[in-house]
Amino acid sequence: MSQKQTKPAAATKAAPAKTAVATTKSKKVVKKGEKKIKTRTLFNALYTKNVKNFGTGFGVQPKRDLTHFTHWPRYIKLQRQRRVLLKRLKVPPTINQFTRVFDKNTAVHLFKLLDKYRPEEASVKKARLLKIAEARAATPKGQAAPKAEKPVQHLRFGIDSVTKLIEKKKAKLVVIAHDVDPVELVLYLPTLCRRMDVPYCIVKSKSRLGELVHMRNASCVALTGVNSADSNELALLVESAKQMFNNNSEHRKTWGGNTLSGPARAILAKRQKAEAKESLAKSKI
C-alpha cells in the first residue's frame, strides 16, 4: 500500500494575517472598536436651521382661518345662517331684486344730496317754534301777526308716510334700504312706485338711511322737493334710478340663490367622475 506523502510542519507556509491597511484596489476595513465618521455637507453659516415645534407651550401657532370654529354671538349667528339660506334656496325675483343696489359712486352723490335735506332735530324745531310764538305774542292788538316762514324741504320717512306720498305722486325720489327685516314691509314699494310712475332706488343700508333722519334705522325715505340749486343733480339721480330700477325689467325676472356649497360640489364632481369612468369601462367591453 502506498502511503500519503506528508510535508513536515516546518515546510508549510503560514497564512498572512489580515491587516487594517488595505491595498489601493481593496476597500478600507474599519475595526470594530472605531466609530464611523459621517461626512457633513457644507452650508452657509448665515442661515441656520430652525426647527419649529408647534406643540402646547412651544412655538406660536401659524395663522389659520378659524371662522368655522368661532363661537359667534346669537345675532351674528342668525345673520350668517340667513346669508347661507339665501344662497342655498331658490329666491323668487320679487325678493331677489333687493340684492341689486346703486353702485358706489352714484350712492355717494345720492347721500350727499340727501344729507342737505335732513329733518331738523327736536331741539332746533323747539327753538324755531318758540321764536315764532314769541313774535306773535309781542305783536299788539289790531296788527297783523308776522307771516310764518315758508316750510323748508326735508326728507320724509316712515312706511305709511312714504306710501301716502307715492299714492299722491308727491314724492320726487324714493330711497329703499336693501336689508329691511322682515322684507315684507317694503316688498310692495317697488311695484307701487312703478304703478304711480315715481322714481325709486335701492341702496345700502337701513342704518345709513337712519342716520339721515336721526334714527337708528329707516326702511325708506322720500324726497318731496329740492332747492333750485340742486335741481340738476336731482334730475341726474332720477334719470339713473329710472334706468336701473323703474325701466329695467331684467332684474325683476331673475331668480336668486340655488348655489351649492363647496363640499356638495366636490361630491357631485366625484360622482360624475366615477360615472364617466364606469361608462368608459362598459364601452370597452
Swiss-Prot record:
Region (Disordered): 1-27
Keyword Zinc-finger belongs to the record: no
Keyword annotations from UniProtKB, A to Z: Ribonucleoprotein, Ribosomal protein
UniProt protein name: Large ribosomal subunit protein eL8
Start-end of Low complexity biased regions: 1-24
Entry's family note: Belongs to the eukaryotic ribosomal protein eL8 family.
Annotated GO MF terms: RNA binding
Any single GO CC term annotated in Swiss-Prot or TrEMBL for this entry: extracellular matrix
GO terms classed as biological process: maturation of LSU-rRNA
Source species: Dictyostelium discoideum
The keyword Ribonucleoprotein appears for this protein: yes
